[in-house]
């Protein structure tokens, strides 16, 4: 029995309609993909009133799929892109704008890498670096600059010999700040 505090107007049981009260549904209703999806879920859902409610006269899924001949009869996007083999296509104006945004994004990323390359020492500018090589060189250079700023911390790390050899090697060059070994 239901609690009468919140929903006092709800009946205890759902009404049962006789067979004469059922109205036949149109064929287009049967073929509508979203209706079919909601009316015939993948897994059956049990209901506490399943014994008392009559079953609606819907055709089986195989009948629906067999009569569904148009490749893409609906003009709205489906929740799943490849639902029943139909892909929603955007208009040409939308595609052009999307492609232009992507070109702008790639251009900005490439400009960022170009600016990063100009902050690296000259020895890295001898050849054109890939994006991965640019990032690795920047990491090495940042670590080198940190070792110059904080030599005590650099010597206490895992490779104290490597840091001291970097500092010793740079002392032979005219401008030690831009040399990395």
Swiss-Prot record:
Cellular component annotations (GO), alphabetically ordered: chromatin; RNA polymerase II transcription regulator complex
Domain bHLH, residue spans: 93-145
CDD domains, alphabetized: bHLH_TS_ASCL3
One GO molecular-function entry: RNA polymerase II transcription regulatory region sequence-specific DNA binding
Main location: nucleus
Top-level taxon of the source organism: Eukaryota
Location of the region described as Helix-loop-helix motif in the Swiss-Prot/TrEMBL record: 107-145
Subcellular location: Nucleus
Expressed in which tissues: Widely expressed in fetal and adult tissues.
Gene3D superfamilies: Helix-loop-helix DNA-binding domain
Pfam families (UniProt xref): HLH
Region named Basic motif: 93-106
Keywords from the UniProt entry: DNA-binding, Nucleus, Repressor, Transcription, Transcription regulation
InterPro entries according to UniProt: bHLH_dom, E-box_TF_Regulators, HLH_DNA-bd_sf
Record GO biological process: positive regulation of transcription by RNA polymerase II; regulation of transcription by RNA polymerase II; salivary gland development; sensory epithelium regeneration; tissue homeostasis
Subunit architecture: Efficient DNA binding requires dimerization with another bHLH protein.
Function, in words: Transcriptional repressor. Inhibits myogenesis. Plays a role in progenitor cells which differentiate into ductal and acinar, but not myoepithelial, cell lineages in the salivary glands. Involved in the functions of the microvillar cells and Bowman's glands and probably, in a non-cell-autonomous manner, in the development or regeneration of a complete olfactory epithelium (OE).
Designated name of the protein: Achaete-scute homolog 3
Originating species: Homo sapiens
């Amino acid at each position: 029995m239901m609690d009468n505090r919140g929903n006092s107007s709800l009946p205890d049981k759902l009404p049962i309609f006789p067979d004469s009260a059922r109205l036949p549904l149109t064929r287009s209703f049967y073929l509508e993909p979203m209706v079919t999806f909601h009316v015939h879920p993948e897994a059956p859902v049990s209901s506490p009133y399943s014994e008392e409610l009559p079953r609606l006269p819907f055709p089986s899924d195989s009948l629906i799929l067999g009569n569904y001949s148009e490749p893409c009869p609906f003009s709205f996007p489906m929740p799943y892109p490849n639902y029943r083999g139909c892909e929603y296509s955007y208009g040409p104006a939308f595609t052009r704008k999307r492609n232009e945004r992507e070109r702008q994004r790639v251009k900005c990323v490439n400009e960022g890498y170009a600016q990063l390359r100009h902050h690296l020492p000259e020895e890295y500018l001898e050849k054109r670096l890939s994006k991965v090589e640019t990032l690795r060189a920047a990491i090495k250079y940042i670590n080198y600059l940190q070792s110059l700023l904080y030599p005590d911390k650099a010597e206490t790390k895992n490779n104290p010999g490597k840091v001291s050899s970097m500092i010793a090697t740079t002392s032979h060059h005219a401008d030690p700040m831009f040399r990395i070994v």
